[in-house]
């Protein structure tokens, strides 16, 4: 029985180490996904702001044209 304890402990240790490494790698992958998602959201908001700004400028130009009467 004693001769089987050491190999079993070594296998248990190696399994624990490999499991720990897998969890760290998975956590690193999860962090990268959040960063990419945040960048996509930021890119969408910047695009929406730019479109709103362009629409506002166009409307102001048309309003100014109607008020002054000369275009």
UniProtKB/Swiss-Prot annotation:
InterPro entries: Antimicrobial_frog_2 (IPR012521), Frog_antimicrobial_propeptide (IPR004275). It comes from the Eukaryota. One of its GO terms (molecular function) is antioxidant activity. Displays broad-spectrum antibacterial activity against a range of Gram-positive and Gram-negative bacteria. Has low hemolytic activity, low cytotoxicity and low antioxidant activity. Residues 1-22 form the signal peptide. One of its GO terms (cellular component) is extracellular region. Transmembrane segments: none annotated. Pfam families: Antimicrobial_2, FSAP_sig_propep. GO terms for biological process: defense response to Gram-negative bacterium; defense response to Gram-positive bacterium; hemolysis in another organism; killing of cells of another organism. Its main location: secreted. Belongs to the frog skin active peptide (FSAP) family. Brevinin subfamily. Expressed by the skin glands. Disulfide bonds join 65-71. Residues 23-40 form a propeptide. It comes from Amolops jingdongensis. The lineage of its organism: Eukaryota, Metazoa, Chordata, Craniata, Vertebrata. This is Palustrin-2AJ2. Keywords: Amphibian defense peptide, Antibiotic, Antimicrobial, Antioxidant, Cleavage on pair of basic residues, Cytolysis, Disulfide bond, Hemolysis, Secreted, Signal. It is found in: Secreted.
């Amino acid at each position: 029985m004693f001769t089987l304890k050491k190999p079993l402990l070594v296998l248990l240790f190696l399994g624990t180490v490999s499991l720990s490494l897998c969890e760290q790698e998975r956590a690193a992958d999860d962090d990268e996904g959040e960063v990419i998602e945040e960048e996509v959201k930021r890119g969408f908001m910047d695009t929406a702001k730019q479109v709103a700004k362009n629409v506002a400028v166009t409307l102001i130009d048309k309003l100014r044209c109607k008020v002054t009467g000369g275009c």
